[in-house]
Amino acid sequence: MAITKTVRMICSNIDGNNNKFWNADLHDDGNVFVLYGRVGYAGQSEGPFTGGQSFLDKKIKEKKKKGYIEFDGIAVESSKTTVSVISDVREVAKKQIQFSSPQLEKLIERLAASNIHNITSSTKITYDVNTGLFSTPLGIVTPASIDEARNLLALIKAQKENGKDEHFGPAINRYLMLIPHDFGMTKVQHFVDSMDFMQELNTLDSLEASYTSFTTSVKENRTEKSIEEQIFNVKLDTLDNGHPDFKEIDKWFENSKKKAHGYDNVRIKNAYVVDIKDNSDMFEKSGKVLGNLTRVFHGTSEANLLSILKSGMKVSPPSTAYIAGKMFGNGVYGAVQSSKALGYTFGRWGGSTAASGWLFICNFAMGKMYNPTRSGSPPSGYDSTWARAGDCNLFHDELIVYSNHQIHITHLLECK
């Protein structure tokens, strides 16, 4: 007995305190099986119901009248269709990232596990270690739904900051349909009031980093997988603490610290040489020629490392810049003080609160630099911004580039 059609519906409604799902599977014998309940709970099963497609159409119509919508941001496995799925990010990373020692293999496993934990601990998205699938009660989240969720998050944040809580009902309803959360039996409004926008953004970034697609075809009860897409084209090597490059980096790390940041006791625990092929090639071809190469630190959370190793640093969508509160527009930010960058990885300015902090060392191709005296994006004709301490009410320099090809990642530092 095979499933010929799957329907996933959800009703998240801030006014009615609804956070419910309704799933139905139509089998080839005409029977329909239903699973329904509150997001975060196992749900109740019903069926089989007879009547086939006509019964299913009738129930869908009834549910829509009650505020349910069909969820279109998923990919659902089917015995008769070709689908995109999420492969096991841990196995893909270990297989494709080129590394030179068992220490690095353990690091890759750790970063993949952190990526998974960041998703599953803050949402109702689950991970199946056997299949490598991340799924919601409605199915598998796709990149398109992640993009939509980012835009909705920016809208919700803007409306909250403008004191227009009464207007963001449709946006929060849609967001919770795309990225289901379990907040128990408490009111949806309580979730909204305590919403951590940076945590939500980090979750979306982690989910996007974990999405690797390959085609699955099912023929006569036999699964054939196409050649797996090359996701990680990157080399990692350890940098021994006796190496001249390590000593030079460590000196810069220590001498650039500012006492005001409170990281005097943080040291470099491990250093790694990073070569992301696409990132290096793009920088050599289009970025380096801009000139004014400047070395910077870039702090990030452990959960985001896998994403950066996969694709390099990317200028985020405008909605992300707004959510993160970036002063000088939508770009990638770097610091010439290690302690400034450490604030982003140890949680002071919106990063994680993990035991280890993580800094990338990058070369920024600054090109024609804009030195602002107030917040905002640079005027047309500039390649970058260097906001200097003392200007714009800043205590420390911030460097911003606005195109991916202006960034070249060279090292990764673990700090404790």
Each language-model region and where it sits:
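Conserved aromatic
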Residues: 46-53, 335
